[in-house]
Amino acid sequence: FQAYDGPPLEPLDLYTAKSGEEIVGQLYNFTDKGERAVSMRPEMTPTVARMIAARERHYKKPIKWYSIPQLFRYERQQKGRLREHFQFNADIFGENDPASDAELIALLIDVLRSFDLSAEDFVIRLSSRNAWQYFANNKIN
């Protein structure tokens, strides 16, 4: 995996266009000196999606990137939930093989083990929205 980062300040519409109501309500946003509506990034997904879309054909596939970005959300502070925090992200783009999902899960396990955690310290639960939707549709009908 290759490290990447993006700007901590992005155009406001990057987040308001497709983010959920909860994220939009937690934005630190303002108008800068150039009269542009901007926001401090609350999550990395829109930033990395913009970066990939802008130069996708120039990248060798699959693209395997990770980051530990600084993020900002205006939300009620509580234990473990700060307005400024860092978050580990790992993504594989340009590959639809389930082996990519397995690779990301293996990476997660390696990261947790690097913190001296063992199998007794964490549980990984897998789920599939499509599988649950299929199950629900077939049980109801």
Residue spans of the language-model regions?
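TRNA-recognition modules of translation machinery and tRNA-sensing kinases, especially anticodon-binding
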Residues: 1-141
